[in-house]
Curated annotation (Swiss-Prot):
Statement: the UniProt record of this protein carries the keyword Membrane: yes
EC number of the protein: 3.6.5.n1
Localization terms from the record: Cell inner membrane
Organism from which the protein derives: Chlorobium phaeobacteroides (strain DSM 266 / SMG 266 / 2430)
A GO CC annotation given for this chain: plasma membrane
Stated family: Belongs to the TRAFAC class translation factor GTPase superfamily. Classic translation factor GTPase family. LepA subfamily.
Catalytic reaction list: GTP + H2O = GDP + phosphate + H(+)
tr-type G domain: residues covered: 9-192
Role played: Required for accurate and efficient protein synthesis under certain stress conditions. May act as a fidelity factor of the translation reaction, by catalyzing a one-codon backward translocation of tRNAs on improperly translocated ribosomes. Back-translocation proceeds from a post-translocation (POST) complex to a pre-translocation (PRE) complex, thus giving elongation factor G a second chance to translocate the tRNAs correctly. Binds to ribosomes in a GTP-dependent manner.
Designated name of the protein: Elongation factor 4
Length: 605
């Protein structure tokens, strides 16, 4: 007789690791279909787990989703399979690490036409660090351009596995998916049976429900959680009542108890989004565990940018929208700030540029807030002449040059996987971006893994787009933070009629300051509309102007009525016009269009 699926040795918790577009979400759909969690008629949209419009549109998974499937294996026993879907993009590696901590196994999905990509390798190392059982899967084997054996050799070189342990599937056509599920049952270890220990549960994701408050998705690692228990969160020591607990099989299914090994959800009327920190440990308040689960780290934003509402009266709407977004996104950090040019807004910290774009799009789409974004920048460390250290995440906070001793900037270690034909192009791009070339490994006869060290500031802009264009889309990249290093950095200010515009300031390397200033002045000249008076656009480092462009004034032809006539009369009219323009210039403020703030993002185009 089949044992009830709640038995801990009949649970399999696993995730899927893959690069963008390698077919992860489609594979998840096939698993849901084969285990009868969903039938085809319910699949109104492909990629059931990617439930944000943005996720489907960009073909990426942003949030960690979890779903429970029941499966009767070939041994006649019933198993509970918990699939935790993970994002595959470089910016979301923290989401991946949290999802991995909730699993015992991982499917390493590689596209048969693309081979191993940089992000796959990065997430694979995270999975190996977490001690997960890896099941390699080659997907899209039915495509005419697939190279199954070549990709298999890459995987064997990467993790030293036997050829017959690599599975071959086509998620779209449903080929090999049954064998894959059987492999999950046989190869992924069951969770440890720790029911007798004090409760410890890991929160790997959370969403905000307008009726129920925060819903925390968790994996029970030790102990038992019952409905009505008083639970305590380690990060802030707050105590809540477990109003509802249960499991997720696409929709929430309430249950009375969750035991060690289970993946489920917890609702306990948490009003403040910050109380259910993703990565936190939940325990019982009456008989608490002594220490939290390891592996949780406060997420560190790498890229900072100012977000300002286009209409200043939408400031409160922007605040509310950011609060709601921050609930579903543990990695978004924001603090209020003011700008002379843009008014009230927020300085936000993001994991990377894709993360920043997604937050901006979600603010505009889901919450209807129109925003202006300032130039993205990184966090600098400024050592003053008196020995104090100041952290600068906004160019306007940069101290006066006379007080600065040294400036340090964050460096990252980057691996770029590409075809060997593009090595020259990538080396050139690396040199342009102040990169330090380390070495190159050959993955096979045509693909290489190049290692560089870059200042983070040089890659947060448009590095990924440039890399894709010079390699015709074949290169993929992954980076991780190393340390801070000393650099010759300066603050470049933009002045309009001698008035600095704080939102256009930027911190750049001294060697690039002149070129950057010249390009920016030229770009702004084409964007800022003509005024009734002359407008001087200047780029300056401290008090030294390094570049200038002038927008000439719109002028009425005051001599139109002087047919011929006395020169002194004409001169008098021109002098009068000049006086008027001068007065206008003193009181007038140059209206800066929104495109001017975006100009910096596309300075090279």
């Amino acid at each position: 007789m089949a044992l009830p699926p709640t038995e801990v040795h009949h649970i399999r918790n696993f995730c899927i690791i893959a690069h963008i577009d390698h077919g992860k979400s489609t594979l998840a759909d096939r698993l849901l279909e084969i285990t009868n969690t969903l039938d085809r008629s319910q699949m109104s949209s492909a990629q059931v787990l990617d439930d944000m419009d943005l996720e489907r549109e960009r073909g990426i998974t942003i949030k960690s989703h979890a779903v429970q499937m029941k499966y009767r294996a070939s041994d006649g026993l019933d198993y509970t399979l918990n699939l935790i879907d993970t994002p595959g993009h470089v910016d979301f590696s923290y989401e991946v690490s949290r999802s991995l901590a909730a699993c015992e196994g991982a499917l390493l999905v590689v596209d048969a036409t693309q081979g191993v990509e940089a992000q796959t390798i990065a997430n694979l190392y995270l999975a190996l660090d977490a001690g997960l059982e890896i099941i390699p899967v080659i997907n899209k084997i039915d495509l005419p351009s697939s190279d199954v054996e070549g990709v298999a050799r890459q995987i064997i070189d990467l993790i030293g596995i036997k050829r017959d342990e690599i599975l071959q599937v086509s998620a779209k056509a449903g080929i090999g998916v049954y064998e894959l599920i059987e492999a999950i049952v046989k190869r992924v270890p069951a969770p440890s049976d720790n029911k007798h220990l004090p409760l410890r549960a890991l929160i790997f994701d959370s969403v905000f429900d307008i009726y129920r408050g925060t819903v925390a998705y968790l994996r029970i690692v030790d102990g038992v959680l019952k409905k009505g228990d008083k639970v305590r969160f380690f990060a802030n020591n707050k105590v809540f009542l477990a109003d509802e607990i249960g499991t997720m099989s696409l929709k929430r299914q309430p249950s009375a108890v969750l035991e060690a090994g289970d993946v489920g959800y917890l609702i306990c009327s948490i009003k403040d989004v910050k109380d259910a920190k993703v990565g936190d440990t939940v325990t019982l308040s009456d008989s608490p565990a002594l220490e939290a689960l390891a592996g949780y780290k406060e997420v560190k934003p790498m890229v900072f940018s100012g977000l300002y509402p286009v209409n200043s009266n939408e400031f409160e709407d922007l605040r509310e929208s950011l609060e709601k977004l921050a609930l579903n996104d543990a990695s978004l950090i924001y603090t209020p700030e003011t700008s002379v040019a843009l008014g009230f807004g927020f300085r936000c910290g993001f994991l990377g540029l894709l993360h920043m774009e997604i937050i901006q799009e979600r603010l505009e789409r889901e919450y209807g807030v129109n925003i202006i974004t300032t130039v993205p920048n990184v966090e600098y460390r400024v050592i003053l002449t008196n020995g104090d250290v100041v952290i600068v995440d906004n160019p306007s906070k940069m101290p006066d040059t006379s007080r600065i001793g040294d400036v340090e900037e964050p460096y990252v270690s980057m691996q770029i996987i590409t075809l060997s034909d593009y090595i020259g192009n990538i080396m050139k791009l690396g040199m342009e971006r102040r990169g330090e070339y380390k070495n190159t490994d050959y993955l096979d006869s045509t693909r290489v893994n190049m290692h560089f060290e870059f200042p983070l500031a040089e890659i947060v802009f448009d590095f990924h787009d440039k890399l894709k264009s010079i390699s015709k889309g074949y290169a993929s990249m992954d980076y991780e933070y190393i340390d801070y290093r000393q650099s010759d950095l300066v603050k470049l200010d933009v002045l309009l009629n001698a008035e600095p515009v704080d939102a256009l300031s930027i911190i750049v390397h001294r060697s690039k300051a002149y070129e950057w200033g010249r390009k920016l002045c030229t770009k702004l000249k084409g964007i800022i509309p003509k005024q009734m008076y002359e407008v001087a656009i200047q780029a300056a480092i401290g008090s030294r102007v390094i570049s200038r462009e002038t927008i000439s004034a719109m002028r009425k032809n005051v001599l139109a009525k002087c047919y011929g006539g006395d020169i002194s009369r004409k001169r008098k009219l021109l002098e009068k016009q000049k006086e008027g323009k001068k007065r206008m210039k003193q009181v007038g403020r140059v209206e800066i269009p929104q495109e001017a703030f975006l100009a910096i993002l596309t300075i090279d185009e």
